Amino acid sequence: MKKLLFVINTMGYGGAERALLDLLKALHSEKLQISLFVLTGQGELACELPPYVNRLNRQYKDCSVLTREGRWYLLGSVLRAGVGKGLLIRRAGYLLRNLWAMAQKGRIQPDKLCWRILAEGAPALQEEYDLAVAYLEGGATYYVADRVKAKKKAAFVHISYAQAGYGRALDLDCYRRIDHIFTVSDEVREHFLEVYPEYGSKTSVFHNLVDRDRICRLAQEGTGFTDAFSGVRILTVGRLTPQKRYDVAIEAMARLKQCSPVPVRWYVLGEGALRGQLEQKIRHLGLEKDFQLMGVRKNPYPYYRSCDLYVHATGFEGKSLAIQEAQALGKPILATDCIGNREQIRQDVDGRLCPLDPESLCREILWMIDHPEECRAYGARAREKTLYSTKGFTEFLGLLDGAQQREEMSCETETVLLSR
């Protein structure tokens, strides 16, 4: 039996975390002993882990890092590692150099600095694994590279690497100690190799696995929108973070309110540190009823099913699981023309792309409202679309053992994967 370890930063309601759950389900096999270590020891999605996955955290908090309680818990973890274990002193040079570099760029990201402290302060795992996988960039990758014993090590990259704020100075050459790197899209691979061109031969694409049947089943369960609104419903799903550019979406909604021939209401499912700032902007523009921050929903799929249009207005992406979920449910999609999004949407075939500014978003939404037949065709083509390739999955299995093991395990899962 092969021992497989996954490490992830948190297990909150995020695209990478949900993609990990789908991967863990696809890996169910009597030939594998699967373990998971959550670096921060917190997150709401741990309750959805398959029963055959062994969670290694001695202490665990079922709260999101995006809530006040979760942020205090995370701060406590950082302080225990930084102060209790002396890492703030030992890593003072590293922290100051990177803080200065961030300040020079006008973009200070404390979370990127904390990942190194958390990774080095977390307990080292004593067991040796056949394959250890860092399923997210940052802390999980630092931990697997330096604190885990394994015959082989792999790391996943889910974002546009440099745009997200990562780079060589932060990473301390951690990828030199990784045997294989998987990126979730071709564009993410290209951007990662702009930072690390020397690792091209050990970097390949592994698309997020999407359980289409599960999404369609859950879309029929529970309730979605409960208000009595009878106009056009726009939906966006994602954390309230700067990357998602909700400020632009709010301004686009203000324009829609003035010029749309039909009532429009925009709903957002997600939580994050920007909530207060966004609520203030919504109040300032008088959009309290028109642009609604609804928080996290355990089952978001009835909302997808009930919306008229899915809009994904972001500054950059890796490969958006939210877009894939909207495609699985046959929704017309408007996304901003940026890395990640443009690889998922074929212009005027299964959706539309536009620049990231309020005027363009408003103009495209009005066009889609005015062309329902075209939008129905976009949704139908999106539903028929193959959402991912299994090539990356087969490559992943190959890291566990030789060709024979890869072929045996691939046969066990191929039917399930291709039916999604």
Feature map (PLM): residue ranges:
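Conserved acidic donor-binding segment of nucleotide-sugar-dependent glycosyltransferases
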Residues: 347-359, 367-372
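Short hydrophobic beta-strand element within catalytic cores of glycosyltransferases
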Residues: 332-335
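Aromatic "clamp/platform" in nucleotide-sugar-dependent glycosyltransferases that forms part
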Residues: 296, 315
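Acidic anion/phosphate-binding donor-loop and adjacent secondary structure
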Residues: 162-167, 193, 202-231
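A conserved mid-protein helix/loop that constitutes part of the nucleotide-sugar donor-binding site
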Residues: 17-22, 232-255, 273-279
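Nucleotide-activated donor-binding/catalytic signature segment of Leloir-type glycosyltransferases, i.e.
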Residues: 52-55, 279-295
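A short, well-ordered alpha-helix in the C-terminal region of glycosyltransferases
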Residues: 283, 360, 367, 374-388, ...
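Short acidic/histidine- and often glycine-rich active-site loop of Leloir-type glycosyltransferases
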Residues: 325, 337-348, 352-353
